Amino acid sequence: MLPSFGYHPWYIKQRTPDWQEHLVQHLEQHPSAVGEIGLDRWIKDFDLADQENVFVWQLKLAAERNLAVSIHCLQAWGLLFELLRAGPRPARGFLLHSYGGPKEMVEPLARLGAYFSIPGYFALERKMRQRETFACVPRERLLIETDAPDQGLPPERIEHSLFDPHTRQPIYHPANLAAVYRFAAEVRKEPLETLATQVEENFQKLFPIIAMGAPPTEAHKS
């Protein structure tokens, strides 16, 4: 398990004056990844300028340390692309979590170092556009996620149930990851074993075992 630390755009209004210092302290103790960070024009009363400032600062921090970044984006893909293109970006790349952007942006984002993760949530019938996009993601840029305990697979695909101990409401169990792999293989029309091997290779490139002392490389600037 690799911990990741960052200020999500939904919660930046709650940050304290010394948030940057606290984030650096966490990354000093666990230098594995930064995120989720990003931009979101979907939430109520969003302040895009503030989101941009917080995102750019965290992206620069990740680039300086060459840490992978997990990025959240809703309805701000053009701005996100421009900020990523301006850099700096981590040399090892960055993850676009539950990528829901245009299919046409996959190739230019991949050239900047993007990996694209597909969640089980995209198995919902109404997510046809997202499935078509992931069918086109370069195989060396594909990752899989559960997005547990939030948005999960459709009920008929869930293999492991979990309930909130306080509310008794169902929440999404991370053990459903294997079912997400099977869904992704369907979308890609690939053998499950082939897809799983490729995803493992991609994961190791983006999230190397920090404890093994993988040497950092310079950040991407253009």
Model-derived features with residue positions:
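Short, function-defining helix-loop hinge/capping sites that tune catalysis or transport
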Residues: Q14, K44, L48, L80, ...
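Distinct, well-ordered alpha-helical segments
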Residues: T16, L23, C73-P88, L95-S98, ...
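Short, cationic motifs built from Arg/Lys/His that form the positively charged side of catalytic pockets
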Residues: Q58, H72-L74, T146, R188
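Short active-site oxyanion
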Residues: N66-V69, R92-F94, Y115, L192
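Active-site gating/metal-coordination segments in enzymes
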Residues: M1-A68, R111-Y115, G120-E125
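Conserved, mostly hydrophobic/aromatic
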Residues: P3, V34-E36, A62, H97, ...
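Residue-level marker for buried hydrophobic side chains located in beta-strands
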Residues: A33, V69, F94, L142-I144
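H/E-rich (His + Asp/Glu) clusters that bind or coordinate divalent metals
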Residues: R41-W42, K103-E104, P108-S222
